[in-house]
Amino acid sequence: RAHHWLPCVDHPSDKASVDFIVTAPDHYQVVANGIQLEETNLDDETKLTHWRETTPLPMKVAVIGAARFGVQYAGDVAGIPVTSWVYRQDREAGFYDYALATEILQFFIDYIGPYPYRKLANVQSKTRYGGMENASNIFYYENSVDGSRSEEALIAHEVAHQWFGNSASEQNWFHIWLSEGFATYGADLYMEHKYGRERLADRLQTERQQVVAFSNRKVAPVVDATVTNWNALLNPNSYQKGAWVLHMLRRQVGEQAFRNGLRQYYALFQGGNALTEDFQRAMEAAGKQDLGWFFRQWIYRPGHPRLSVEWDKPRRKRLRLKVSQLQDGPAFRFPLDLKAVSTDGTESETWTIEVNEKTAEATVKCKFEPGQVVPDPDTWLLFSK
């Protein structure tokens, strides 16, 4: 939407450095991308403010903001100054809430690599979205500050965008999941890092519900070349399903290879543009395996598995399990964990079976009679029942 306010080539593949020289009433503070070069009060009760970002960025994340701001320096992270810009009446709550950005920024520097810009400003604004990841100058909605730090995950999402979406950008809009899916899962990773695996599972289960609900309304792949209204791509396929693809990829290649692959992908495309196949190649190199089948079924094919799990009463301490894929079309391929819980709830055991066909069966050792068999107890698979 940048072309609605700024004459520009409004496409993620056309990046530019920016200078914003703004003359505004002198009671306003002005913030924009990059580093402030000048702030001068003029004779007519106006003020000239000059901001410059020399690192080329997509025009969708170029921005200026002017308001009666309270401004706080929150600290340096790896030499990057972090500031908070909030309406003066929200000064106390806003400074407290936005100060979280310092620890969030440190997490992503450690996980992905060096921060691509020279400052990070977090700005209360009238954005139509919950947040907007403007390069080095993130905007959050007006009610994002209340003194409770309730928008920690939103801040993490927008900070993650500084690497994925702003610096390493999608080559075209069809591959926007490389921005939105990565930022969504980036927030998941941060929340897991800070609060533990249970918080990650809770977030992923909510995201899974959003994907399933969307797929019930619209059958479409993550990379959907039929779309002509680009705003229609801002949907759960790009955000939540994109995050789920990354989560399943993490299991497929392993923890260290996943992290290495993300870092290698970012290092290769920092400041540039990429397609899904570029990310696939980076993950194949890191994971030392062919992932063509994985990307075909999760990115280029619509839908997800719909599963039914059956089991027989154990005989001679052996339990027969049957997994059926009920969705239309061919089978998906995935590992599935199945957790049996005894009728009295005191015993449990988990097995992993490889599902490659519409029906998969396995016989396993089991010392008790299951009262239930729970599919995917540790939240690793995108599926519905």
Regions found by a protein language model. Name each.
Residues 377-385:
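Short acidic/polar inter-strand loop motif in beta-rich domains
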Residues 98-99, 137-205, 262:
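Zinc-dependent metallopeptidase catalytic helix centered on the HExxH motif
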